[in-house]
Design a protein with these regions (language model features):
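Flexible, glycine-rich surface segments
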Residues: 159-252
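Sec-exported extracytoplasmic/periplasmic mature domains
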Residues: 51-59, 149-153, 264, 268
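Second-shell loop/turn segments in exported
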Residues: 33-40, 126-134, 244-245
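Acidic/His-rich structured neighborhood in mature extracellular/periplasmic domains
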Residues: 84-196
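Start-of-domain marker
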Residues: 22-87, 98-100
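Bacterial Sec-dependent N-terminal signal peptides
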Residues: 1-23
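A cross-kingdom marker for long, charged
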Residues: 29, 217-301
Length: 301
């Protein structure tokens, strides 16, 4: 009886520990509505496999409690499925809670248009950190590490460095595989370019922005709106530096797609001089988004 109780206790403890190990809470959705003549079962299987792979894998040595898991989303739109090969687009989103509030802020909202991989119904996805398995697990590994890197950066200065390094390892292996979406000079919005926007010295100040904007800015606004907003205003100056160094950097696009609408709310109660300052900064960077940016200068009543 004592032995059985001890076994039950140890097993329960191990189960409890494993439930604390996973870092990601990632919602995965696969949309195959544009594909005809293929059973939807393969796409249901793909969705489940992707979800289990991301959410059940232990990606770090850091212990996360359930309420600390990183919220992310992946929406795969399948454009073509032929000879077990999937071609499509992947929308990835990453969010984080703001301290002492119910508000959740978006860290990343990015569409990857260069997604191709082989998948058959029931294929098992195998994690291997040190060697290349296939393009699907490579893509999932890359975004898992990018999610971790950006999340850690938003809480501490350069806190995400180990995970940018891991993402770089994935990119290096992928480039040897010959798969699309990874090559350095393929285009300025692929996975290699996205990673470089965080690690290249010309654009790496986007990482400082992640910390200043979120930890010193949004997290502080709950207790002092003026102090937090001032930190956000200061953080935006990093965008000017990026623009001056690399005006076509995907870092600028990623910031726009995740933050422009939020900034309208951030500055809704700011002094007019502060709103004007931010408006002037952003209109230089995003001249085609003046209608949205103008709402910062002239908030709707």
């Amino acid at each position: 009886m004592i032995k059985n109780s001890l076994v039950a206790f140890v097993f329960g403890t191990l189960c409890a520990f494993s439930s604390f190990a996973q870092e990601l809470n990632c919602t995965v959705e696969v949309n195959s509505s544009s594909v005809e003549g293929t059973s939807t079962e393969v796409f249901r299987s793909l969705q489940q496999s992707m979800s289990e792979y991301l959410n059940e894998q232990q990606w770090t040595n850091t212990v996360f409690s359930p309420n600390e898991r990183i919220e992310c989303r992946m929406f795969l739109t399948v454009k073509e499925y032929k000879d077990d090969k999937v071609k499509g687009e992947l929308q990835v989103q990453l969010s984080r809670p703001v301290y002492n509030s119910s508000y959740t802020t978006t860290l990343l909202n990015f569409k990857d248009t260069k997604v191709e991989f082989n998948y058959r119904d029931g294929d098992r996805l195998v994690f291997n950190e040190n060697s290349w398995e296939d393009n699907l697990t490579g893509i999932l590994n890359y975004y898992a590490y990018l999610f971790l890197a950006m999340d850690f950066d938003s809480f501490s200065p350069n806190g995400g460095q180990p995970y940018y390094d891991k993402a770089a390892g994935v990119v290096q292996m992928a480039q040897s595989s010959g798969e699309i979406g990874w090559r350095t000079f393929e285009d300025n919005r692929n996975r290699s370019a996205v990673l470089s926007s965080f690690t290249d010295s010309n654009t790496g100040m986007i990482r400082d922005l992640l910390y200043q904007y979120h930890r010193k800015g949004l997290d502080e606004m709950v207790t002092s709106a003026d102090k937090g907003r001032a930190a956000i205003t200061e953080s935006l100056k990093a965008l000017e530096k990026i623009y001056d160094n690399a005006p076509m950097s995907v870092a600028l696009t990623m910031f726009r797609d995740s933050k422009l609408d939020e900034l309208v709310n951030v500055y809704s109660k700011a002094p007019q001089s502060e709103r004007e300052e931010v408006f002037e900064l952003l209109k230089k960077l995003y001249p085609t988004d003046l209608e949205r940016i103008n709402k910062i200068r002239t908030p709707e009543e």
